[in-house]
């Protein structure tokens, strides 16, 4: 048997995927109020929130001063987040997509019940083959980082798997609406921790982000994340897609650990097979 020390901090409470209520198809965003709540630990053996919490705006006013954080391909090049293109990044989709709502899968009415109207507009825009579903290819084409690079394949596949309730490799309008909210929440968190407003997360900013989300992880671990998920350069920094991927996987692994750590001690003992089973069953 092996012992795996975990230290103290881990966000959320026991449950399924981030923010998902029991039996829910869709994991929630970091501030969804579900099983993970705000992404902060509730107290006890896993530590408490950092002073001020991680969700308030950074000092000096609003997060960026620009309405476009660089998620969907809109805006104009310039600063790290650009300016909003006509129609905004989250308002109506570009005229080249669907234009006004047309007869189709959902008729001429508004968004289906329980679907965010803005998410529905973007669903119509992203669904380029008019199939009524969003594939990984379509999702990847629709999502860009602040440096105008496309989201990486790993993050896109992870999000498809999270919100694909039919396990068909694509998401319907309801899954897309949940995904849209999920990305919005992580984007807002990304903006807050990008203290220098560079459009990316540096090593120092990532260390601060993990700490304020409730994780008590060593600088060496943060450096490992930077080495693994940031492009090699003199000053490596993490884009939005990798930030979403890293934080979501940390949440999922935390849940797996918490299920075993019934005494909330920060340490567990388990066999190698139990360890790999626990990890493999939580892979997204």
From Swiss-Prot:
Compositional bias, Low complexity, is annotated for 8-26, 65-75
The answer to whether UniProt assigns keyword Zinc to this entry is no
Q: What is the effect of changing residue 165 to R?
A: Does not affect ubiquitination by the BCR(KLHL12) E3 ubiquitin ligase complex
Give every EF-hand domain span.
114-149, 155-183, 181-216, 217-253, 254-283
Question: What effect on the protein does mutating residue 167 to R have, as reported in its record?
Answer: Does not affect ubiquitination by the BCR(KLHL12) E3 ubiquitin ligase complex
Self-association state and partner proteins as the record states:
Heterodimer; heterodimerizes (via the EF-hand 5) with PDCD6. Dissociates from PDCD6 in presence of calcium.
Name of this chain's protein: Peflin
